[in-house]
């Protein structure tokens, strides 16, 4: 069951706002776990969870890799059959480079770009990529970044 923006824009907006709040709460939990376990806590199951929370009730197939072609503007993402292998390679690169690249934003920026380039999910790729980027920045800094939740204020 899902609501489409075209069918009920106000309900869609409310569901999307709640999803973003839930995704942030899940992300804070993921950061806490990663701070205890290190970079090994960054894996595809975490990404699946972050994606599922971002698109719950607004898209089918949340939290799993796409099994169909998609088109994103002028970018044609890799074939869906290549996505699982590309994601395994992506995770491996993050793990391998973690100790080799100490700069606080290079790997998070790479993660943001690479996830959006692979476009592993049907919906919510940008939200999932931004969450992954944030998690890696927090892990590199050794703390959940200070501040307040601003998601609802920004999307209203």
Which sequence ranges carry the predicted segments?
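FIC/Doc superfamily catalytic core
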Residues: 1-156
